[in-house]
Amino acid sequence: MPSAINAAVAQQTAAGSVPSTTSTTTEGTGGGTGGIYSAIISRNQPIIKVKEKTYEELHKKCLEENILYEDPDFPPNETSLFYSQKVPIKFEWKRPREICENPRFIIGGANRTDICQGELGDCWFLAAIACLTLNKKLLCRVIPHDQSFIQNYAGIFHFQFWRYGDWVDVIIDDCLPTYNNQLVFTKSSQRNEFWSALLEKAYAKLHGSYEALKGGNTTEAMEDFTGGVIEFYEIKDAPKDIYKIMKHAIARGSLMASSIDDNLGFHYGAAPRSDIGELIARMVKNLENAQMTYSTVDYQGTDERPAWTIMPMQYETRMSCGLVKGHAYSVTAVEETTYKGEKMRLVRLRNPWGQVEWNGPWSDKSEEWNFIDEEEKIRLQHKIAEDGEFWISLEDFMRHFTKLEICNLTPDTLEADKLQTWTVSVNEGRWVRGCSAGGCRNYPDTFWTNPQYRLKLLEEDDDPEDEEVICSFLVALMQKNRRKERKLGANLYTIGFAIYEVPKEMHGTKHHLQKDFFLYNASKARSKTYINMREISERFRLPPSEYVIIPSTYEPHQEGEFILRVFSEKRSLSEEVENMIEADRPSKKKKGKPIIFVSDRANSNKELTTDEDAGKDGEKTHVDEKKRSSAKAREKSEEETQFRNIFRQIAGDDMEICREELRNVLNNVVKKHKDLKTEGFELESSRSMIALMDTDGSGKINFDEFRHLWDKIKSWQKIFKHYDADHSGTINSYEMRNAVKDAGFRLNNQLYDIITMRYADKNMNIDFDSFICCFVRLDAMFRAFHAFDKDGDGIIKLNVLEWLQLTMYA
């Protein structure tokens, strides 16, 4: 059955962009960007991808076979723990039933006091969990509550996380790492409650290992729990209405966290990667010295059991006031009360350790509470307990804390949430080294090669108090998979973005803005800074118009994937800019060479002629006379005479040459161009040229075919010399984009990526041999496509035989 070769599918899958009707990308499903491009980058994957079984299917199978689930993708061994070095002690992986009697998934509802940090620097993750427990709808989405150690128990559990635009279901078994029968990592304040430990394991699986969770920003986990978008404030530079912002965030159900810089340059909860050995050493020491501590609560007749306490391994620094530097806290409430006749604004925070609290004004036992009546204490949920939660005045909060992170919920977080009015557009992209990883504006030669996204702001805000015609929107740029790739040496890139207004004459077009535009136009808005966080976001207010967003890493040549989200209060459109895929075609007065299928030559000599073959006899005669006149003029030239003599000497009487002979001819001619530094053409290059220029299937090319090839090479040679400004004999892969355009070809980013992968060396340079081979292939494949595309609609249909004939002999 013939398959349509059409560009529409791949580009819509990749970025929601409007595709070129002349693209030659085949239809495809899955695999990232789809189409031929995804077929190339995933060609080593199994031909048939078996659909993974769902939680329900696996759970049912375990019950039917009366077995406990064992996760093959996250096994109970060292590979799931640490990747940088081995742990000198042996952990035992145990199921909850082996750790304590009467284990429970959740006891009395999941709440923020259930979470106690273990021997891992993931306080950022636990602070986010504590925030999550404040929103029961979100909590039930992340932690499906229909799971139990009693009814239909099969040793299998699942949790759901937002992952770069999609919600994914992470399935795990319930084997947990222990030492001396104690959980090593996160645990509940109640010994027989395990939802927090299992949630941490699922999150570790999502990122490849427990070690991958060491160090991070709370908003990273908040986003993975909600699909929300972050706002980040340096408290010393916070707006005057910061209390109002925090109060409004709590009312909207947003998640919020805060932290204190340690003045050592560390992020909270994170040690330098080189210190993982020290982390493990301290962890071992703490585990070996850990003592069980028991509460005085009477547990008779309940499912609760005594909790143990292990002080977490820490790079954090405790202050005399009880707060901890380099540490993340959950913001669980923001309230206002009356104190001695005056309004007092308070902030409630929680330490993920489940202990170690603020001991200043408004702490659990402070004298300020003596002036608050009992009813107000109940409203504020004040209690005296070493549970890690405490109140602090807004003034002291602003004095001691340095960062505030807010994760705002988006319309797709909960379908029933009617308070949200944002419209959201999501675009996925990638920076490719040597092609579309151009770095920031400091690198003008490559900045313009970064992916570009058009933003159309169509409607102004509904704000009767604001007379300006303004559109409010938020841009969020997130880099993908960097935490999961830590074991391969990956770190977070320093990222940011800039926004430019598109000239009115270019509104509605799909053209990739070129280098000169950015040299002579200033940005209308940009991220305040480039920062090495997973996501950077910024609010903007601009007049209705058409803009282009340029996401980038700070330095060029840094390869990675990203997701760009645009949130607007009113209707807007956002899509990736993709050039229309096309090539300049020769004048219709020139008769094109027919394309002949190899298998048809011996039979019917079937031809697929170009549109130019249709013409009147008088027109043909005129063209022939013009060709003969032009040929005579060329033959008079010294180069032509020399050219024919060389060709005749090598080709012999049949005046046709094979790949070895073509190589000799080209190299003999190229040698005479002293200003072109090249070692000549490789045999494989001439083999490819023969295949692409051979129109009669003889495996050789005649003088006319060679003449056509040489004319092309001469024009391409001029382009090469123009961009080889330093006469090194190479051009860099970024310059190749302009060279391709100068040669009459217009391609999209996916095709530029492929050219870079196929023809550039490890230094992202393209030599003359590879340069010419690339252009010969582009020229031949465009001519072939146009020959098949008789109705000019940008779609051709080929059966398998035709497709293989066209692609294998090329």
From Swiss-Prot:
Asked whether the UniProt record includes Membrane among its keywords, one would answer no
Active site (record annotation): C123, H327, N351
Which CDD domains does this UniProt record tie to the protein? Calpain_III, CysPc, EFh_PEF_CAPN3
Tissue distribution: Skeletal muscle. Low levels in spleen, intestine and bone.
Q: Which parts of the sequence bind Ca(2+) 4?
A: D789, D791, D793, I795
For this UniProt entry, what is the primary localization, expressed as one broad class?
A: cytoplasm
What Gene Ontology terms describe where this protein resides (cellular component)? cytoplasm; cytosol; myofibril; nucleolus; nucleus; plasma membrane; protein-containing complex; T-tubule
Localized where? Cytoplasm; Nucleus, Nucleolus
Where along the chain is Ca(2+) 2 bound?
A: D694, D696, S698, K700, E705
Return the annotated region ranges for Domain III: 411-579
Keyword terms = Calcium, Cytoplasm, Hydrolase, Metal-binding, Nucleus, Protease, Repeat, Thiol protease
Any one GO molecular function term: calcium ion binding
Query: Where is the region Domain IV?
Result: 639-809
User: Which stretches are tagged as biased composition: Low complexity?
Assistant: 9-27
E.C. number(s) listed in UniProt: 3.4.22.54
Quaternary assembly: Homodimer; via EF-hand domain 4. Interacts with TTN/titin. Interacts with CMYA5; this interaction, which results in CMYA5 proteolysis, may protect CAPN3 from autolysis. Interacts with SIMC1. Interacts with UTP25; the interaction is required for CAPN3 translocation to the nucleolus.
The protein, known as: Calpain-3
Gene, per the UniProt record:
CAPN3
